């Protein structure tokens, strides 16, 4: 039986761990981030990966930082055949990677060398890409730079957001890993080095990047809204109030009004001008301090005039 140490944290990683367990791999231990307080009530919550491990009585290691930790020493002591990572969220020291007797491999949610880094799904949607995918690659000290063992692509639809794509890519990564590991163990794969001239990066989204530039085209604003939904969520300032954008629609029309101006409005509809003469319907909003609101509920509750031509969004 092939022994594995699995390293991962979010929901993306949990089905991948479950599949290894269900398919006869001997998971010696799971390394995941420490429990975090979540939600308005700040409830201390185990990561999805830890929850799977606990359910199967697998040893759980939770270092705040893996490098130099006692948890790293324990992982090295276990001497697994494979180290498998999926969205673990930390750099792994070379000493740890070399503890794997066969290989240390990573399930990365992009078509490498495109979108190395921590937010590949967000960037694929935000940039309006028509497809993304999963890469299974050797791990090395440099971030997401190892030779690729397998790749598979899937389309990004106009309805997809980061939530739906994470779910699709998790399933894809699970299936591709299960196909790849037996071939790796049998020595049947030829690793393909990444083309360094094609490398791009997807660093973690910063809070200031969550604000929508109303001068972008309507399509690119829609892409940004979907790329940041359900987390961390895009926002604009609507009549001076920070307002999250949950759902918008690109309208098939043009306007000469300045970006941020009201193009049309009735009891159930509000559309604003964007860059490149675009028009964007605001369908579901969340003003600061309030719950999500349909545009109908928002318009019923606002005292703002929101008249056609009025500059309201920035």
Curated annotation (Swiss-Prot):
<feature type="binding site">
    <location>
        <begin position="110"/>
        <end position="113"/>
    </location>
    <ligand>
        <name>(6S)-5,6,7,8-tetrahydrofolate</name>
    </ligand>
</feature>
<dbReference type="GO" id="GO:0004479">
    <property type="term" value="F:methionyl-tRNA formyltransferase activity"/>
</dbReference>
<keyword id="KW-0648">Protein biosynthesis</keyword>
<dbReference type="InterPro" id="IPR005793">
    <property type="entry name" value="Formyl_trans_C"/>
</dbReference>
<dbReference type="Pfam" id="PF00551">
    <property type="entry name" value="Formyl_trans_N"/>
</dbReference>
<keyword id="KW-0808">Transferase</keyword>
<dbReference type="InterPro" id="IPR002376">
    <property type="entry name" value="Formyl_transf_N"/>
</dbReference>
<dbReference type="Pfam" id="PF02911">
    <property type="entry name" value="Formyl_trans_C"/>
</dbReference>
<dbReference type="InterPro" id="IPR011034">
    <property type="entry name" value="Formyl_transferase-like_C_sf"/>
</dbReference>
<comment type="similarity">
    <text>Belongs to the Fmt family.</text>
</comment>
<comment type="function">
    <text>Attaches a formyl group to the free amino group of methionyl-tRNA(fMet). The formyl group appears to play a dual role in the initiator identity of N-formylmethionyl-tRNA by promoting its recognition by IF2 and preventing the misappropriation of this tRNA by the elongation apparatus.</text>
</comment>
<dbReference type="GO" id="GO:0005829">
    <property type="term" value="C:cytosol"/>
</dbReference>
<dbReference type="InterPro" id="IPR044135">
    <property type="entry name" value="Met-tRNA-FMT_C"/>
</dbReference>
<dbReference type="InterPro" id="IPR005794">
    <property type="entry name" value="Fmt"/>
</dbReference>
<dbReference type="InterPro" id="IPR036477">
    <property type="entry name" value="Formyl_transf_N_sf"/>
</dbReference>
<protein>
    <recommendedName>
        <fullName>Methionyl-tRNA formyltransferase</fullName>
        <ecNumber>2.1.2.9</ecNumber>
    </recommendedName>
</protein>
<dbReference type="InterPro" id="IPR041711">
    <property type="entry name" value="Met-tRNA-FMT_N"/>
</dbReference>
<dbReference type="InterPro" id="IPR001555">
    <property type="entry name" value="GART_AS"/>
</dbReference>
<dbReference type="InterPro" id="IPR037022">
    <property type="entry name" value="Formyl_trans_C_sf"/>
</dbReference>
């Amino acid at each position: 039986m092939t022994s594995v140490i699995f390293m991962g944290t979010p929901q993306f990683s949990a089905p991948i761990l479950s599949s290894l367990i269900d398919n006869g791999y001997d998971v010696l231990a799971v390394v995941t981030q420490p429990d975090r307080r979540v939600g308005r009530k700040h409830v201390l919550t185990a990561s999805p990966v830890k929850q799977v491990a606990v359910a199967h009585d697998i040893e759980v290691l939770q270092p705040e930082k893996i490098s130099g930790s006692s948890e790293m020493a324990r992982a090295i002591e276990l001497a697994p055949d494979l180290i498998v990572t999926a969205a673990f969220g930390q750099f792994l020291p070379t000493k740890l990677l070399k503890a794997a007797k066969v290989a240390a491999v990573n399930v990365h949610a992009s078509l490498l060398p495109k979108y190395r880094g921590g937010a590949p799904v967000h960037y694929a949607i935000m940039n309006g890409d028509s497809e993304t995918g999963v890469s299974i690659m050797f791990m090395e000290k440099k971030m997401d730079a190892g030779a690729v063992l397998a790749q598979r692509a899937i389309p990004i639809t106009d309805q997809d957001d980061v939530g739906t794509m994470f779910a699709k890519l998790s399933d894809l990564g699970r299936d591709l890993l299960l196909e790849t590991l037996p071939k790796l163990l049998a020595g049947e794969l030829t690793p393909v080095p990444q083309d360094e001239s094609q490398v791009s990066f997807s660093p973690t989204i910063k809070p200031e990047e969550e604000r929508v530039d109303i001068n972008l085209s309507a399509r690119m604003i829609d892409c940004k809204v979907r790329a940041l939904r359900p987390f961390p969520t895009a926002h604009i300032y609507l009549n001076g109030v920070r307002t999250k954008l949950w759902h918008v629609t690109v309208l098939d029309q043009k306007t000469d009004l300045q970006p941020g101006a009201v193009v049309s409005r009735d009891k159930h509809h509000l559309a604003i001008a964007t860059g490149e003469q675009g028009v964007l319907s605001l369908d579901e909003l969340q003003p600061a301090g309030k719950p999500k609101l349909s545009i109908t509920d928002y318009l019923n509750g606002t005292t703002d005039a929101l008249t056609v031509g009025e500059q309201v969004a920035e």
